[in-house]
């Protein structure tokens, strides 16, 4: 088996734990709801055959403890377990939970692995010594001796989709592996993907749901702040209502989280003399201002400019003539630091976390209430448990509703539901404030009511009426190259051979929304198949008739997760 470039490091070899001890009463801490869910899954598990189960439940409902019990059962049967996470950032806190639950350290597989440690892990996996392996998506391809259980945690997360160098969705590939090797796979989420719920409706998957929080704390109260009625001070982005509530939380020694899913200080810099917008030399995207490193940075290719003594390339004016538009996490930090000068504030984003150790320290400090205010990007939504956090404020709840992504409403609901779930996970009920310029939007309204199931029913009906995934199939063909003329010629060749098939629509070619990426020009076709045919065969037959152009790449993306 050829392994992809891997993601991981080896912790330690500890096979001293007796697998029967894992089932002793001291490990069984499930409440009645969890026990019923565990029993249902175990009946399917003991059939020793392929099955896909969705383990569903709101944040804090105890999904992890349920599948821990199944892992214990799997170990007692001398079989291996694989837990996939969408991001390695989840593993640090999670490793401790695994060690406490099972009494030994799991093997870990992620991007920091060295060749020597890679060999050790693969040896343990092949020999069967690796009882539990936690990994990012490429761990799926490891050659397990006797894999008996596969867990895909946060199965809805779009980062399971690898977008470059061999496009695949690790969640879907995990289901394929389980079906081939005949074992149980459990998909876990508080906000399942619409694809998974559709498969449940089609009787392909089994749905098991935990209805209540483990702690019995009420769900957080959600308040919508209509920003059209709010007059913000200059250079301010946080409403007075939200700031006043933060002040009350500070007085009670409770924590607040401000969420904005934009890295850096400002997403766009403009010369006020001539209107020039600073863009990447390799990509058709704006450079983002980062105060931390005094640079303008492209988030697609890493190209950067020093923001000290900048000169406009169009008119030659210097840095005192530039305006920053929009807000990122650093701009919110500046505002909150002015407003609450004595508060201990933590910035929680990939730019402000240097290593896994740094991440662990920040998570531990937040857990121990050593920070008063946390300002974070999507990284903060990833399964963390902070018992003192009782307020979440979303700076721009509408941000991801904009654009042409068919999954925009679904992704927005999932992200906001997950970040809302950080509030009130301890003994004190939580509050959530959503700053929105479109409070009448149905996605925002459903979130306020915490009516998740109603949102999913409506969203699936919209997809059915429009014949969009998951009801129908879509694929993208991206044609890219460094020479724009050659890319155009290749697209013309494809257009001349476009198949004419009933219930198959082919759109394009058209410039991709990100028309230049890492120095390559990009055009795309979109294939929309409505009747359940094998879309791969349609594309294969089409491309086989078209000669390849030297220097031009053709990339096929089945079920695209983004449309850039």
Cite the ranges covered by each PLM segment.
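Interdomain "pre-motor" coupling segment immediately N-terminal to P-loop NTPase/helicase cores
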Residues: 1-21
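Inter-lobe coupling/hinge segments of SF2-like helicase ATPases
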Residues: 19-31, 35, 39, 47-488, ...
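Short proline/glycine- and acidic-rich turn/helix-capping motifs at secondary-structure junctions
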Residues: 508-518, 554-564
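Short conserved micro-motifs at the rims of enzyme active sites and ligand-binding pockets
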Residues: 489, 537-538
């Amino acid at each position: 088996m050829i392994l992809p470039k891997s993601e991981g490091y080896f912790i330690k070899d500890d096979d001293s734990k007796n697998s029967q001890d894992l089932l002793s009463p001291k490990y069984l801490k499930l409440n009645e709801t969890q026990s019923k869910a565990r029993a249902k899954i175990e009946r399917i598990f003991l059939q020793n055959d392929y099955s896909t189960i969705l383990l569903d439940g709101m944040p804090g409902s105890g999904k992890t403890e349920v599948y821990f019990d199944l892992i214990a059962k799997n170990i007692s049967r001398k079989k291996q377990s694989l837990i996939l996470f969408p991001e390695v950032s989840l593993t640090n806190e999670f490793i401790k939970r695994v060690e406490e639950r099972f009494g030994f350290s799991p093997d870990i597989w992620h991007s920091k692995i060295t060749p020597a440690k890679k060999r050790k892990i693969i040896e343990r996996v092949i020999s069967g010594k690796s009882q539990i392996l936690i990994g990012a998506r490429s761990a799926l391809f490891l050659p397990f001796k006797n894999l008996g259980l596969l867990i895909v945690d946060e199965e809805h997360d779009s980062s399971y989709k690898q977008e470059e160098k061999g496009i695949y969705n690790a969640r879907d590939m995990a289901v394929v592996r389980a079906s081939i090797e005949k074992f149980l796979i459990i998909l876990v989420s508080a906000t399942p993907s619409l694809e998974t719920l559709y498969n449940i409706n089609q009787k392909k998957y089994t749905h098991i749901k935990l209805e209540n929080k483990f702690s019995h704390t009420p769900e957080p109260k959600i308040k919508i702040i209509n920003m059209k009625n709010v007059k913000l001070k200059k250079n301010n982005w946080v409403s007075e209502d939200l700031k006043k509530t933060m002040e009350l939380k500070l007085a009670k020694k409770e924590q607040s989280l401000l969420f904005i899913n934009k890295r850096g200080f400002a997403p766009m810099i403009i010369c006020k003399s001539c209107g020039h917008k600073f863009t990447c030399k390799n990509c058709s995207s704006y450079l983002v201002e980062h105060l931390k490193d005094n640079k303008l940075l492209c988030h697609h290719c890493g190209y950067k400019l020093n923001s000290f003594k900048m000169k406009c390339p169009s008119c030659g004016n210097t840095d005192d003539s530039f305006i920053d538009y929009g807000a990122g996490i650093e701009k919110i930090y500046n505002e909150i630091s002015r407003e609450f000068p004595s508060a201990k504030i933590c910035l929680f984003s990939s730019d402000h976390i240097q290593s896994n150790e740094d991440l662990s320290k920040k998570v531990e400090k937040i857990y121990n209430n050593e920070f008063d205010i946390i300002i974070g990007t999507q990284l903060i939504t990833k399964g963390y448990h902070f018992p003192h956090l009782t307020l979440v404020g979303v700076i721009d709840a509408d941000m991801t509703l904009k654009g042409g992504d068919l999954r925009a409403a679904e992704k927005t609901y999932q992200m906001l539901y997950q970040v809302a779930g950080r509030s009130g996970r301890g003994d004190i009920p939580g509050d959530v404030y959503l700053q929105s310029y479109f409070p009448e939007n149905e996605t925002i309204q459903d979130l306020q009511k915490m009516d998740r199931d109603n949102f999913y029913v409506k969203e699936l009906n919209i997809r059915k009426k429009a014949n969009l995934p998951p009801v129908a199939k879509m694929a993208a063909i991206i044609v890219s190259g460094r020479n724009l003329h050659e890319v155009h010629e290749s697209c013309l060749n494809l257009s001349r051979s476009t198949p004419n098939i009933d219930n198959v629509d082919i759109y394009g070619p058209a410039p991709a929304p990100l028309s230049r990426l890492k120095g390559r020009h990009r055009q795309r076709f979109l294939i929309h198949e409505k009747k359940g045919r094998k879309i791969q065969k349609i594309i294969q037959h089409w491309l086989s008739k078209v000669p390849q152009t030297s220097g031009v790449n053709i990339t096929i993306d089945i079920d695209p997760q983004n449309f850039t």
